[in-house]
UniProtKB/Swiss-Prot annotation:
Compartment list: Cell membrane
PANTHER family from the UniProt entry: SEC-INDEPENDENT PROTEIN TRANSLOCASE PROTEIN TATC (PTHR30371), SEC-INDEPENDENT PROTEIN TRANSLOCASE PROTEIN TATC, CHLOROPLASTIC-RELATED (PTHR30371:SF0)
GO MF entry, a single one: proton motive force dependent protein transmembrane transporter activity
Subunit relationships: Forms a complex with TatA.
Source organism (scientific name): Carboxydothermus hydrogenoformans (strain ATCC BAA-161 / DSM 6008 / Z-2901)
Protein name: Sec-independent protein translocase protein TatC
Keyword Protein transport: yes
Transmembrane regions: 18-38, 70-90, 106-126, 132-152, 153-173, 191-211, 213-233
Length: 243
């Protein structure tokens, strides 16, 4: 006997429950994370402390708000298993068995690639770009950067790297759906090169060419990796009844 389809009101009520539980999880996670903010702040400040520099704050609430921002981000990370589970419980009933299996298989890959992108960026590109930019003034100018501006710069720099590292996943999905192919990616490599540099210019937080080049390099590598992956993918349509 098939389950009775949910009404619009029941869907909205289920969505409301997902949002409430997710928000509570984020609040609890943020409260816990606030105790460890200084530890993570010291990690983010490595490029600055390596140059014997100190950051400043220029209004009364800036230091507190910056720490609160970091705590909320860490809280979201801590709460992510609960958030993902809530989202999954909401969307899974409307998916086919094959779709559920595919998504469950891809979620760990997506998380690993996102984290790998941020870690790679922080220990390579971010360190190099930040030190270069801070020393760019030479003896003529001395940097006086606020903690709020620095953290915003760091987040705007690192998060796009996590996102662009998802390129192989995007290509895998599109190839599975027979939207693109290995031949298509090879044929359009020159256009991809142009798109990569446009994306690098759009995603980097500053206008400097160095940051854009450091962003473009891994993007180009990821595109080549995606071409390699697409070569071995056989298009497959999702099938199966929704249960």
């Amino acid at each position: 006997m098939e389950d009775k389809p949910m009404t619009l009101f029941e869907h909205l009520e289920a969505l409301r429950k997902v949002i409430i539980i997710s928000v509570i999880a984020i609040v609890i996670g943020s409260i816990i994370a606030y105790n460890y903010v200084d530890y993570f702040l010291n990690i983010l400040l490595q490029p600055v402390t390596a140059l014997k520099m100190k950051l400043v704050f220029i209004n009364v609430t800036e230091a507190f708000m910056t720490k609160l921002k970091i705590a909320i981000i860490l809280g979201i990370i801590l709460a992510s298993p609960i958030i993902l589970w809530q989202i999954w419980s909401f969307v899974a009933p409307g998916l086919k068995p094959a779709e559920r299996k595919f998504i469950l298989r891809m979620i760990p890959v997506i998380i690993i690639l996102f984290v790998a992108g941020i870690v790679f960026a922080f220990f390579t590109v971010f360190q190099i770009a930040t030190r270069f930019l801070l020393q760019f003034g030479g003896d003529i100018m001395s940097p006086m950067i606020t903690i709020g501006k620095y953290i915003s710069f760091a987040l705007n720099f690192l998060i796009p790297f996590g996102l662009v590292f998802e390129l192989p996943v995007v290509v895998y999905i599109l190839a599975k759906l027979n939207i693109i192919s290995h031949e298509f990616l090879v044929k359009n490599r020159k256009y991809a090169l142009l798109v990569v540099f446009i994306l690098a210019a759009a995603l980097t937080p500053g206008p400097d060419v160095i940051s854009q080049l450091l962003m473009a390099a891994p993007l180009l590598i990821l595109y080549e990796v995606s071409i390699f992956i697409a070569k071995f993918i056989k298009p497959k349509e999702f099938s199966g009844e929704r249960k």
